[in-house]
């Protein structure tokens, strides 16, 4: 998925989350979720964030490959456990939400994701990156965000 689609899906996830749970600082929570959803693609040197950290992202891509370890559920689980242990529950949830929302969207593509990496169980879907179907999904997510915001305000 493209960065904008990841951001839109993460944003709707944030809106639903803060609607049901008390978030101390919703602005920082949202920023952290959105940053994390883009940071997952640091293993792709041509991603939105990867371009800004080119030497680092190229090394990560060379070592781990794209949609390998960094696209598994192991990483958000580790972040969640460590941050929860450090009594940073809200940060842990924000990172997990951003990370998992990214993985969910990448599952919808034919390239799919090995969510239980290193086990080779790939889960994938029909939406090609940049296709009309992804554009339609982005429009639907934008509409969902607008509708959700109407009910919040």
PLM features: residue spans?
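N-terminal membrane-targeting hydrophobic helices
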Residues: 1-153
């Amino acid at each position: 998925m493209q960065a904008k689609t990841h951001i839109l899906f993460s944003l709707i996830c944030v809106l639903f989350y803060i609607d049901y749970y008390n978030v101390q600082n919703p602005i920082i929570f949202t920023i952290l979720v959105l940053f994390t959803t883009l940071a997952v693609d640091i293993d792709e040197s041509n991603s939105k964030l990867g371009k800004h950290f080119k030497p680092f992202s190229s090394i990560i891509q060379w070592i781990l490959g794209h949609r390998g370890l960094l696209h598994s559920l192991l990483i958000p689980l580790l972040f969640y456990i460590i941050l929860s242990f450090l009594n940073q529950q809200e940060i842990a949830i924000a990172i997990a939400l951003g990370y998992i929302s990214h993985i969910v969207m990448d599952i919808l593509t034919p390239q799919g994701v090995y969510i239980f990496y290193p086990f080779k169980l790939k889960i994938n879907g029909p939406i090609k990156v940049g296709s009309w179907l992804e554009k339609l999904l982005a429009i639907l997510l934008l509409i969902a965000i607008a509708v959700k915001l109407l009910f919040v305000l």
